[in-house]
Amino acid sequence: MIKRLRGLLVMLCCVAGMAVAEEKNILVTSGSDRATPIAVVPFGLQGGSVLPEDIADIIGNDLRNSGYYSPIPRQNMISQPSQASEVIFRDWKALGAQYVMVGSIVPSGGRLQVQYALFNVATEQQVLTGSVAGSTDQLRDMAHYIADQSFEKLTGIKGAFSTRMLYVTAERFSTNNTRYTLQRSDYDGARAVTLLQSREPILSPRFAPDGKRIAYVSFEQKRPRIFVQNIDTGRREQVTNFEGLNGAPAWSPDGSRLAFVLSKDGNPDIYVMNVASRQISRVTAGPGINTEPFWGKDGNTLYFTSDRGGKPQIYKQSVSGGGAERVTFVGNYNANPKLSADEKTLVMIHRQQGFTNFKVAAQDLQRGSVKILSETSLDESPTVAPNGTMLIYATRQQGRGVLMLVSLNGRVRLPLPTAQGEVREPSWSPYLN
């Protein structure tokens, strides 16, 4: 069984004897230029207390994860100023830093006041200054906020470090005793909280565009059904109860509709439901498996995986009618489509002709070229940050399911800290502020 047709092919075997896809475009396997050196100096703390989180470390990691910046190691810092007036620019020029951030933390009345300033080292000019306040429990929130502000000021791209992630863990205690847990965490895997536990599989969690609701597939009734749950209240509703497969939910950009896969009429096909009225309409038809829908920003186009041509490839089709158009031509396997924020890049699970490994790849939709982003194999379930700079995917390392973060420019690849057990099915939230 090929597992990459996530959600659907967990339950169905792939069709055998598939024809080889035609190679039409270019494959790029490596290469990227150097990230911009930046120094995020440890923030000064008044009062001599010890905080549970290192705010400067979190900011530096955020900027690194974007693939745009390379933080200078603390042990290399010649000086460690905490105020703008203490910055000696020759120290940072000697280290090759293009930017330096300093900051201070002042406890006051049970809260923390965090001040920060960012400088261009070459011009010796301040490019950003600000302050943010919160409790000790909000240190990570404040750090992500400062990283968001800094990233947007330097790049013009809205930061996505204050976003969240969904994922599923599976802990097997014995042959017939596995616990599945739906978790929500910071985008970097920190501060995980449990949203749902079940003795039956949970698949395909997806944030609604408002960030307040999620959709997912649950087997708690011994068959797949789609649920919608309010994150804050925990209230949940079953929204599908059709015979056969109910899988791969995907929210429309305005949150009013869900696309998903049903097999009630025979082959697995894509349908769209009005969430308020529960009315459904069929989008795809014909032979083969059609699955893994993903909405375009226009709210009318669906990208999806289909094996109608022999092997899994990605197609797009209007929900209002018309035929499907094939999108991918490089490789003999392309599945699980996701679009970048500007819709210029298609992220997918890709297998090259003549290889057996499944990789995360990005296709330039204008030129058709494909770039391999991951260095792992058996990759699945890519999910893209709302600003299109990073992605998270599931893979296997040392016999265990794990999550990996990759920058879309290919400069950063790192594992994310998660709970014990098999970790899978990541889904990135929209902007939450």
UniProtKB/Swiss-Prot annotation:
SUPFAM superfamilies assigned: TolB, N-terminal domain (SSF52964), Tricorn protease N-terminal domain (SSF69304)
Please state where this protein is localized: Periplasm
Keyword list (alphabetical) reads: Cell cycle, Cell division, Periplasm, Signal
Q: Where in this chain does the entry annotate a coiled-coil region?
A: none
Pfam families attached here?
PD40 (PF07676), TolB_N (PF04052)
Record's signal peptide: 1-21
Keyword Ion transport recorded: no
The record's annotation in Gene3D superfamilies points to: TolB, C-terminal domain, TolB, N-terminal domain
Q: Single GO cellular component annotation?
A: periplasmic space
Subunit annotation: The Tol-Pal system is composed of five core proteins: the inner membrane proteins TolA, TolQ and TolR, the periplasmic protein TolB and the outer membrane protein Pal. They form a network linking the inner and outer membranes and the peptidoglycan layer.
Which HAMAP family does its entry note? TolB (MF_00671)
> What is this protein for, i.e. what is its function?
Part of the Tol-Pal system, which plays a role in outer membrane invagination during cell division and is important for maintaining outer membrane integrity.
* Protein name per UniProt: Tol-Pal system protein TolB
